Structure formats: C-alpha cells, structure tokens
C-alpha cells in the first residue's frame, strides 16, 4: 500500500509542479489538441450519491500517507483529479485497478469531478491546476478520445 501511495504522490507532485504550462499539448512538434474543443457538460446538482466513495478514497489516502514522525501536506482532491485524468487513458486490468483505488468507475467519476469544481459560485474561488504531460516519443500514440474526455471534464 505504501508503494501505491508513493506512486500516487509522485503523479500528483508532477502534475502540480508542471500543471501551470500552456494549453498546447504537442509531441514531436504536432499539436495534439487540433480538433479537440471543450464541450460544456451538464453539472450534477446533487453530488451526495458518490460523495461517500470520494470521501472513502480521501480517508484511505490520508491514513496510508500519515506517519507520526512526519508532517505531511496532501490534497486528496488533487490526487483524485490527477488519477481520474490518467485513468481516462487506461484500459483493461490497469483501468480496473485504478477504478478500484479511486472507488468509482471513470464514467461516473468524470462528471462528478466536473460538477464538484463547477458547484462554486462566481464569488467563491477554487482553482485547480491540471495538465497532461507526455514524453516525446515516435512510438507514442495518443488517442483523440482520451484528449477529448479530459478536455471536456478537466
């Protein structure tokens, strides 16, 4: 479990440190976001049904990350956002494992996360910095569906 938490923290720290970049996602000079436009999604008014799973994830993450001899600063919401974005590109056993850790399938989690962020009024402030960074590699194939889902929800 500690190895899983370390992996999750690495993803989130990387997403946090690199998340302030531009909206241009490119590999080998090709803009992967060509043809990808954010579609407005419906905001779920009542998030309570799946809030138990999100809270459970948060508690499990904090329990696994806390040691009496250390001070830990951790945002379960940021971790969940980073994992949710990543899970949209996973499939098979990897996706199943990620959904098990997160407590919800990505098809449920995507609209929940979108709605959570959009529930705040204009005079309240909650900003998250999310980004997807890819290693430039000629063998890398980035599916348009992955980019579209993340553009729409995150």
Identify what each model region corresponds to.
Residues 5-9, 16, 20-154:
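Extended, solvent-exposed regulatory segments
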């Amino acid at each position: 479990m500690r190895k899983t938490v370390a992996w999750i923290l690495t993803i989130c720290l990387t997403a946090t440190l690199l998340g302030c970049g531009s909206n241009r996602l490119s590999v080998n000079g090709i803009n992967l976001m060509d043809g990808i436009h954010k579609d407005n999604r419906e905001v779920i008014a009542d998030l309570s049904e799946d809030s138990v799973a999100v809270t459970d994830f948060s508690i499990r993450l904090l329990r696994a990350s806390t040691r009496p001899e250390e001070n830990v600063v951790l945002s379960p919401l940021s971790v969940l956002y980073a994992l949710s974005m990543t899970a949209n590109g996973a499939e098979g056993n990897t996706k199943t494992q990620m959904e098990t850790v997160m407590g919800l399938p990505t098809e449920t989690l995507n609209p929940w996360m979108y709605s959570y962020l959009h529930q705040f009024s204009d005079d309240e402030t909650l900003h998250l910095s999310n980004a997807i960074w890819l290693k430039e590699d000629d063998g890398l194939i980035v599916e348009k569906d992955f980019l579209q889902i993340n553009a729409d929800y995150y």
